[in-house]
């Protein structure tokens, strides 16, 4: 396995440096243990490990949303079982470079929203800043206490042809990926525990502890222990899993824009018990969407009046509003000179070579070398994709030049870097793929410095020679190991440096509503499954020679199913009663049919995703299995037999969700609202079934069969037999299902 990779590297991968192999086909020293381990286990065992890594991530509910793809919601996170590895000596240099760059960008941020001496003295062209959508004039002279304005920072790095690591992108607005990084490491630790121990891969938990301590040290509204919320765009955002994961993991309240309001100058969280004052907002919403009053007026993701509350120092927002201006790729062309001016130092981590088209000589260079450059808009918010000049025809190049000439200050040309390759497990073998490393830096308020996560999240391209690497374009994530010189003890995120008073975690009103509907859809789905199973069983056992109109039990079941699911006209029409199979299959698997089981399950899952931070890991494993079963149910070529099997599987999974949460949830608002929804739905469906099944009288045998089906649908048949020990009688059935106070399925119990 390793030998074939080395041979392929020597003969087929010549243009690129490789992370594991030298040009002479030798293994890099810091890769030797990993390479030896992979060679020992072989391809078949490696394939099994790959499957196990995927299973671990699926069970943990790790997902990613892909925009513009009908099937892109909650797509399983893909992790390569082959890590990216850095030696401790090389990482020390990278770490120093990242700290220096963060300090530099922090100074630039302070200046741009302060005295603007960098612009006044000509170190940064004013057109580059004032034309960038990330520069928010409303944030001028608005700052956090202390020197550290930039609390979190991420950088995408790649190794260039000269062997040095280059900075490709700066991420300062709402840097993402740290939660996925933690999950990647957790999955790799479970699958390769010995390999991680033998290589002394450094722990990454210290990053989260530093971040939490920095937040706890912020002083606002005269409170030593501030209330922190994580502001998320919502379940459709590409990294919503991470938002829910971090908020749950670190004990923050997950909030959407609709959960917050500004009143009396303060930001308040709308909870089921009233308004709670918010002190710190960790935002995962792009800054221009954070306040529709002062920024993007059509935004539904932010909070009206948030900027004024920040301006009045009634709330702190991290990272500060307006810091997206630092993501401007045009700044990379000026950072070397700015570093000398502000720090008196050369950049330790160079940026990818960048030419800003707002300068005549640079514009000329870009036009003359466009075939070898990547053309980017300076503002990501314009939704303009990077253009690779080498992929364009002469006509397209001329058209691009005309576009740039209209607004030259809005474009940069960047060198098309030949990224290094790294081993990736593709098609059950090791193949070389170009890779980018995302690193993370956090402010340490106690020591007045910045600290770098000793690791990160690497991404490799699924295709050979692909340089545009992102999760949206199918990039595969990789755990990133920094080899330590000795074993180290993992830092606890839960354990803070100093003892802090208990902060009650409140339930936002929006989350409370979602929990209520989660309970309702859970019970609605369970009743639908049970009634559909009985209907399908009755239909399969019915005599083909007897018309359904002449079969009172089956016709009653079908009509009751229509009423309970709210899918009129349904089986109230004679044509559907003549041939019920088509309508039955629609009611089972058509997610577009409002009232169908598939639609009900989809609504159940939607509400569950919205309160992801309130549900346990085991609960998410069950939810993932429900989602997988829903996917199987939606196959258009399914038969009644397959539908019946799906119903059997689904009811077990629904009851597993019910049992796990009813037993394990603390008896607080979350538990009560979930059960209120359940009780209301249970009572309503019980009444509908009783009315549909028992309101008409037929022959004695049919009546008994309908009473038995009614009891089965309410999971009360065994209870009836033990209680009455007699034949089925209407009085006993109604008494048990309506008036019995100890029967959890009776109407009065609800």
Labelled PLM ranges:
Residues 134-166, 280, 357-371, 390-473:
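Phosphate-binding site of ATP-dependent enzymes
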Residues 91-112, 131-137, 247, 263, ...:
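Active-site nucleotide/adenylate-binding loops and adjacent lid/helix of ATP-dependent enzymes
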Residues 2-89:
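N-terminal low-complexity, Ser/Thr- and acidic-residue-enriched intrinsically disordered segments
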Residues 56-145, 160-162, 172-228, 234-245, ...:
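Alpha-helical transmembrane segments and their helix-helix packing motifs
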């Amino acid at each position: 396995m390793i030998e074939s990779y080395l041979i392929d590297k020597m003969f087929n991968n010549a243009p690129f440096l490789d992370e594991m192999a030298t040009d002479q086909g030798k293994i890099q020293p810091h890769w030797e243990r990993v390479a030896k381990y992979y060679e020992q286990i072989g391809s078949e065992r490696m394939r099994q490990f790959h499957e196990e890594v995927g299973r671990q991530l699926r069970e943990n509910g790790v997902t990613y949303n892909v925009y513009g793809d009908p099937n892109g919601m909650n797509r399983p996170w893909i992790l390569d079982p082959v890590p990216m590895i850095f030696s401790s000596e090389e990482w020390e240099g990278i770490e120093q470079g990242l700290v220096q760059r963060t300090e530099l960008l922090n100074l630039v941020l302070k200046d741009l929203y302060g005295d603007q001496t960098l612009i006044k003295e000509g170190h940064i062209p004013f057109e580059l800043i004032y034309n960038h959508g990330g520069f928010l004039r409303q944030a001028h002279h608005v700052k956090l206490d202390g020197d550290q304005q930039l609390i979190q920072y991420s950088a995408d790095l790649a190794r260039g042809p000269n062997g040095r690591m280059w900075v490709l992108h700066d991420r300062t607005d709402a840097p993402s990926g740290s939660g996925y990084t933690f999950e990647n490491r957790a999955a790799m630790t479970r699958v390769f525990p010995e390999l991680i121990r033998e290589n002394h891969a450094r722990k990454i938990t210290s990053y989260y502890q530093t971040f939490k301590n920095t937040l706890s040290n912020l002083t606002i509204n005269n409170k030593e222990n501030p209330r922190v919320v994580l502001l998320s765009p919502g379940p459709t955002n590409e990294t919503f899993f991470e938002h829910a994961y971090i908020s749950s993991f670190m004990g923050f309240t997950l909030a959407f824009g609709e959960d917050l309001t500004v009143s009396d100058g303060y930001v308040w969280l709308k909870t089921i018990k009233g308004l709670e004052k918010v002190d710190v907002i960790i935002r995962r919403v792009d800054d221009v969407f954070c306040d529709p009053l002062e920024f993007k007026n059509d935004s539904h993701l932010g909070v009206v009046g948030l900027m004024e509350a920040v301006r009045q120092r009634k709330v702190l927002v991290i990272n500060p509003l307006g810091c997206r201006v630092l993501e401007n790729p045009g700044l990379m062309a000026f950072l070397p000179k700015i570093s000398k001016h502000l720090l008196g130092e050369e950049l330790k981590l160079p940026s990818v070579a960048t030419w800003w088209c707002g300068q005549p000589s640079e514009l000329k260079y870009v036009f003359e070398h466009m075939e070898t450059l990547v053309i980017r808009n300076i503002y990501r918010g314009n939704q303009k994709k990077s253009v690779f000049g080498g992929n364009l025809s002469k006509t397209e190049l001329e058209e691009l030049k005309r576009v740039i000439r209209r607004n030259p200050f809005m474009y940069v040309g960047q060198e098309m870097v030949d990224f290094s390759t790294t081993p990736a497990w593709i098609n059950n073998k090791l193949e070389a793929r170009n890779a980018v490393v995302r690193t993370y830096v956090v402010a340490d308020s106690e020591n007045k410095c910045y600290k770098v996560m000793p690791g990160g999240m690497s991404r490799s391209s699924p295709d050979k020679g692909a340089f545009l690497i992102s999760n949206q374009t199918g990039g595969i994530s990789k755990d990133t190991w920094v080899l330590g010189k000795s074993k180290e003890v993992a830092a606890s995120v839960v354990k803070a440096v100093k003892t802090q008073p208990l902060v009650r975690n409140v339930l936002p009103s929006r989350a409370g509503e979602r929990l209520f509907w989660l309970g309702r859809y859970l019970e609605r789905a369970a009743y639908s499954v049970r009634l559909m199973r009985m209907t399908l069983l009755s239909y399969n056992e019915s005599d083909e020679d007897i018309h359904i109109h002449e079969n009172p039990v089956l016709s009653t079941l079908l009509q009751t199913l229509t009423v309970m699911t709210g899918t009129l006209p349904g089986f109230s029409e004679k044509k559907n009663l003549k041939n019920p199979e088509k309508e039955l299959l629609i009611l089972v698997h058509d997610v577009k049919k409002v009232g169908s089981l598939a639609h009900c399950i989809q609504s159940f899952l939607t509400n569950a995703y919205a309160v992801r931070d309130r549900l346990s890991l085991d609960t998410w494993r069950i939810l993932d299995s429900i989602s997988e079963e829903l996917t199987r149910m939606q196959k258009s070529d399914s038969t009644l037999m397959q539908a019946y099997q799906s119903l059997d599987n689904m009811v077990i999974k629904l009851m597993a969700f019910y049992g796990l949460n009813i037993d394990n949830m603390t008896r607080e608002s979350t538990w009560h609202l979930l059960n209120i929804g359940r009780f209301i739905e249970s009572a309503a469906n019980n009444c509908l079934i009783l009315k549909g099944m028992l309101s008409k009288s037929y022959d004695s045998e049919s009546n008994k069969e309908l009473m038995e089906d009614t009891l089965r649908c309410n999971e009360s048949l065994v209870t009836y037999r033990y209680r009455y020990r007699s034949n089925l009688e209407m009085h006993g059935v109604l008494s048990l299902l309506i008036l019995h106070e100890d029967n959890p399925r009776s109407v009065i119990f609800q």
